[in-house]
Amino acid sequence: MQFILYIIGQYLYYHINNLSLQLISLFLGYFFCTIICSIPKETGDWGLITALLIVGINETMSALIYSYKKYENNIIVKTINGIKIGIIYGLFVDSFKLGS
C-alpha cells in the first residue's frame, strides 16, 4: 500500500511541477511581449514591424524545433513553447487594447 501511495505521489509531484513550469513560462512569454511591444511604441510607430518580427521569429523557431521528432517531449522545448504561446497571447491582448 505504501508503495502505491509513493508511486501516486511521485506521479502527482511530476505533473504539478510540469504544470507550474508551463504556467510560469506562459506568464513569462506574456511579460516579454509586453516589454517588447512597449519599448518601440515609446520611440515611434513601430508596432506593426515589431509584431511582424515577433511572429516571424516565432514561426522560424517552431519550424526548427518541430522538424525533429526527438525533441517533442523535451522539457526545454515545452518551456520554449509555453513562452511562445505567451508572446502570441500578449500580441492578441495588446491588439484588443489598441482596438478599444
Curated annotation (Swiss-Prot):
Keyword Chloroplast (UniProt): yes
UniProt entry tagged with the keyword Ribonucleoprotein: no
InterPro entries: Uncharacterised_Ycf20
Record-stated family: Belongs to the ycf20 family.
PANTHER family according to UniProt: PTHR33787, YCF20-LIKE PROTEIN
Subcellular location: Plastid, Chloroplast
Highest taxon, organism lineage: Eukaryota
Name under which the protein is recorded: Uncharacterized protein ycf20
The entry's keywords: Chloroplast, Plastid
Record-level GO cellular component terms: chloroplast
